[in-house]
């Protein structure tokens, strides 16, 4: 008995799926042998790509984060104006500004003045003479152009810088005198330079205007006498004998018009005492011979022209 088996109905959504999906060919596509072969360069490119890929999924390599470079500058997230630090502020100040600030601070705080005096280095002869030369240069630049530089008008124009120079000279000179200064060579070097500065002071027609210049010569003459006496007591007066100070002081006395004659006499007495009683005629031929022999000994030329005897004496 033939029976018909009814085909179960297909749900409608199956038809909808088949309608929306793209149809695929049922037949197996045929490929030519050329398409099935792989080129050698393709294999190489594929191998290079696999080797260059980072093995992020491999358990043998763990990713590490590189340390951040150290920054030597502090981060300043908020940019705003601020005053300079003290070291940077001092770098912008010149010598005159620093001197003025330090002077005002010492005036307001007297205890700070003693600290500055004990902390500051001892002034040298060159630095002190340089300060005096600066005052001297200011004095020379203060003269009026044209006219008579020795007149009363010129004196009134330069009276203030002239007073500043003389005040500085009177302040620096005691600093280089004994007993504050123990080295005779330092004292003599300062007096030599300070006397040259006094020689350069202007001369005036009016005698009353020359009183300050004459007073400066008197003070420097007393300083010379004090230093000569102290130098004669120390080390046998070696600084006076071998420094050529007799000639230097004689030249200063000549430029001063004889106002340093007392210092010249003091130096002559000291050198005469050191040479002994037989050398009363200091500066004579005998004294000149002694000076000549002394200079030869110091220079190492003594006895070079004397023939040397060979054989039994």
From Swiss-Prot:
One of its GO terms (molecular function) is proteasome binding. Its main location: cytoplasm. The keyword Nucleotidyltransferase does not apply. It is found in: Cytoplasm; Nucleus. GO terms for cellular component: cytoplasm; nuclear membrane. The keyword Signal does not apply. Pfam families: Cut8. Residues 16-84 are annotated as: Disordered. One of its GO terms (biological process) is proteasome localization. Keywords: Cytoplasm, Nucleus, Protein transport, Transport. Binds the proteasome. PANTHER family: FI02826P. Involved in ubiquitin-mediated protein degradation. Regulatory factor in the ubiquitin/proteasome pathway that controls the turnover of proteasome substrates. Targets proteasomes to the nucleus and facilitates the degradation of nuclear proteins. Belongs to the cut8/STS1 family. This is Tethering factor for nuclear proteasome sts1. It comes from Aspergillus fumigatus (strain CBS 144.89 / FGSC A1163 / CEA10). The lineage of its organism: Eukaryota, Fungi, Dikarya, Ascomycota, Pezizomycotina.
